[in-house]
Amino acid sequence: MIKNDIWIGEMASKGMISPFEATLIRRVNDAPVISFGLSSYGYDLRLSANDFRIFRHIPGTVVDPKNFTPDNLEPAKLHQDQFGEYFILPAHSYGLGVALERISVPNNVTVICIGKSTYARIGLIANLTPAEAGWRGNLTLEFSNSSSADCRVYAKDRKSVV
């Protein structure tokens, strides 16, 4: 069953999402943002500005999912201009960040996170692991830039929907 905004709002008041925006925010200080907050059947999470790491190829190495080492992940610089704070994800690259919001999933619900079309249109694909019943914390957000151009990944703006 997909939960609606009323249920999400009630659960947020009990600590399910923090910080919580009770409405879908599309503008901040009269400037457009990639929306975040509560929508009809979901909640748009934001990427934290605290840490974003980009996968870099190290010649002679092979990435092994059974023996992963973070040596291939390097911190990305946080940029800022009139459009907001952002990281640059190089073409055909992969990045990891963390959600600004902390979630506390109820013990009888599993949360599914999906990417948003705003980013998919520019080739930025979000791959997020479901948060299982009872899980607590800040979700790791995974982004793949499938385009041939570098992409901005905005911090504190919408990234995925829970």
Predicted regions and their residues:
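DUTPase catalytic domain/fold
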Residues: 1-162
